Amino acid sequence: MSGVNEIRSTFLNFFAANGHEIVPSSPLVPRNDPTLMFTNAGMVQFKNVFTGVEKRPYHRATTSQKCVRAGGKHNDLDNVGYTARHHTFFEMLGNFSFGDYFKENAIELAWKLVTKEFGLPKDKLTATVYIDDDEAFGLWKKIAGLPESRIIRIAGSDNFWQMGDTGPCGPCSEIFYDHGDKIWGGPPGSAEADGDRFIEIWNLVFMQYEQLEGGVRNPLPKPSIDTGAGLERVAAVLQGKHDNYDIDLFVALIRAIADLTNADPQGPQKASLRVIADHLRASSFLISDGVLPSNEGRGYVLRRIMRRAMRHAQLLGAREPLMHKLVGALTREMGQAYPELIRAEGLIKETLRLEETRFRKTLERGLAILDEKSASLSKGDMFDGDVAFTLYDTYGFPLDLTQDALKSRGISVDQASFTDAMERQKAKARAAWAGSGEAATETVWFPLREKLGATEFLGYETETAEGAVTALVKDGAEVDSLKAGESGAIVLNQTPFYGESGGQVGDTGVLTGEGVRVRITDTQKKAGDLFAHIGTVEQGTLKLGTPLQLDVDHIRRSAIRANHSATHILHEALRQVLGDHIAQRGSLVSPDRLRFDFVHPKPITAEELARVEDIANDVVLENAEVTTRLMGLDDAREAGARALFGEKYGDEVRVVSMGNAARDHGNNAMGWSVELCGGTHVKRTGDIGLIAVTSESAVASGVRRIEALTARGARAHANHNLSLAKAAAAELRTTVDEVPARITALMEERKKLERELSDARKKLAMGGGAAAGGAAAGIREVAGIKLMARAVDGVEVKDLKSLVDEAKKQLGSGVVAIVGRSEDGKAGVVVGVTADLTARFNAVELVRAASEALGGKGGGGRPDMAQAGGPDGAKAEAALAAIESAIGKAG
């Protein structure tokens, strides 16, 4: 058992055989946990289980969890590549007990696995326990037979785990492997503990207390177990390696990088190879879990990881984007264990390629400035933090890249001055923002939510209902009434009006009561689930407690329903045409149109877009039933329901299914499209009528947008396009079907005529006489050389160059200057100097003299050919005279 994949399987299968549920790794973006940027431990997905908030159908679990530590408190980024065991991405093997077994079974299982299944020699293993955990100390003696000298008591946080300031906590027990006295270091707890001889391979956490405020700890009624073993560390030990980067997985990745860069895996570029191998894993897994490079949040951390790897690719001499070429090697090594890598392979490759292409320009600019500003520094010096901030703020060059680039020279960055510069920038931004007062008007809703509770939403079943006013808000404050002509927000005890959320706009309609009428123009959700009906009192006075008839605008709601259901159908159609990596990034569902943003690395072709539209309309024509059901969140996910990336969901979710499940690319037995959604939808897909995609565009890096119309809007769009086609056909005197061919023929004819016109103008310009420039035409001698100077009309600047080249050949030796006047009154000028005269006359200097006469500035080119322009074409003769004068002075 030597390979990483076999080690992972052995671990999981061992615990499965001992009554544990094998639970798939959760995504790297934690679900419903805003406190974490990335999943960084195996217990993260079980956090609510340990605290009793969530119930699972099992009491024992085992996982191999994807983890990232880069950014925030857990940040290993700067050390990766330069140490034997630091990674940004790693796998955490673990077993968990939720109130089932405790210390004795946990130690027994761990010992059996490492000694029997993994076959590690007992005399190479040492255990640690918390300083006063006598129970664990005794169990290691009893179960493992370890002598007391190899059961080490440790004080402090290293051997006591806490979820936070309050909550579950407990002592830890760690298993260490002894690499032998050939490597420096001492056992844990000793003065030499920081050495590399004794390596921790497994940590067992015994959750047996609940910590209260003030530091009081009470025993938990059902103690639990949380363990974690780094797969890469375990593999290194089992493969007889002292360095994680020497295990089979990394050897394969590093070999793939070395093959593409001709680098020596054991040579001076070893650190760069390791950085790329590690960061390739982190980048690929983050992208497969829905994170895309951006300038904030998780996307910015991903961008930093990617760009650090790309910087090292440049150090290896890669002249073209490299990272995307390595994804195949990664999927070969890890795709079987993590099929999401294979599903997202296309997206990963394209995202890496695009980012590296963009970053190479940034890298060139940043490194040039860095080299210039650090040229005078020596080993031990400190680089100016203000300059480092300028590189970051102006050129997009992250601080860690600056540090990394200077590290090899022994130069550090003044982080204090970098931080000061960052704070000054933030202060300027705050000062520049005058503020809108919007935040102040929002504070009223939180106490209202606590007082009134959630608004009961009736809108899934009905568009009309009765309700009573429970609160009125005007200008951010509660009021007792709203008079005729006044506007405000009305809160009701129940409502059929949909509050804006999930991309769907809020409902409009009318509230009526005895002597009262209110026009509702929008409905919003406040403080989570309090519905605020925004409107104006048209008649009477609206007071607290007023009973009302509530009527949603039926026609508008029907259009919104059709558009919302269409977004689900388009989502699935996009996946069918473009691939399983398609994931929603946002949407707008309004009565007159829909907009859908999704992950895709490149523009969609016209052919692909047509296929998407065809598939979507096939589903509409099926007139299949649209069903909704309430399910537990985990049940819905297991059933294959798609969730919106970044959206927070409760324990119970609404699942919307539509389309015939038997269709090609069907999602699952529940339907062709199955999504978590709280919006309103049609009863049958046929109610949508028609879907017409009207545009496709880019929103951000790796994010595309399509816009579409449905029902009456789609029909109007189709009719409008047909009218345009008929009008074009009539104008072209052909049929609608023949319009494209007729346009192509006309375009070819136009190009031919333009070429003929250009040739005629050039011939006319070179023909001499008044038509070609009058007195300015002809060849004359100035300062002992021949000068051909002409002003011409209707010849473009690009054609002036060819005229000058031709004239230079005719002259043999001399200077050619031609000014071309355009119809808008501007002018372009091109000057050519034959090769034998460039030592005496510089075309750039001559053309600048002409540009000044034309009212322009500058000009550029080579000593033998240069061009410029100016706004005043009437001064063409003066420009030629200026060139002649400049030749006279130079000669």
UniProtKB/Swiss-Prot annotation:
Its cofactor is Zn(2+). Transmembrane segments: none annotated. InterPro entries: aa-tRNA-synth_II/BPL/LPL, Ala-tRNA-lgiase_IIc, Ala-tRNA-ligase_IIc_anticod-bd, Ala-tRNA-synth_IIc_core, Ala-tRNA-synth_IIc_N, Ala-tRNA_ligase, Ala_tRNA_ligase_euk/bac, DHHA1_dom. It catalyses: tRNA(Ala) + L-alanine + ATP = L-alanyl-tRNA(Ala) + AMP + diphosphate. Its main location: cytoplasm. Keywords: Aminoacyl-tRNA synthetase, ATP-binding, Cytoplasm, Ligase, Metal-binding, Nucleotide-binding, Protein biosynthesis, RNA-binding, tRNA-binding, Zinc. The keyword Ion transport does not apply. It is found in: Cytoplasm. Its EC number is 6.1.1.7. GO terms for cellular component: cytosol. Binds 1 zinc ion per subunit. GO terms for biological process: alanyl-tRNA aminoacylation; negative regulation of DNA-templated transcription. The keyword Transcription does not apply. Signal peptide: none annotated. One of its GO terms (molecular function) is alanine-tRNA ligase activity. Pfam families: DHHA1 (PF02272), tRNA-synt_2c (PF01411), tRNA_SAD (PF07973). Consists of three domains; the N-terminal catalytic domain, the editing domain and the C-terminal C-Ala domain. The editing domain removes incorrectly charged amino acids, while the C-Ala domain, along with tRNA(Ala), serves as a bridge to cooperatively bring together the editing and aminoacylation centers thus stimulating deacylation of misacylated tRNAs. Belongs to the class-II aminoacyl-tRNA synthetase family. Catalyzes the attachment of alanine to tRNA(Ala) in a two-step reaction: alanine is first activated by ATP to form Ala-AMP and then transferred to the acceptor end of tRNA(Ala). Also edits incorrectly charged Ser-tRNA(Ala) and Gly-tRNA(Ala) via its editing domain. PANTHER family: ALANINE--TRNA LIGASE, CYTOPLASMIC (PTHR11777:SF9), ALANYL-TRNA SYNTHETASE (PTHR11777). This is Alanine--tRNA ligase. It comes from Bradyrhizobium sp. (strain ORS 278).
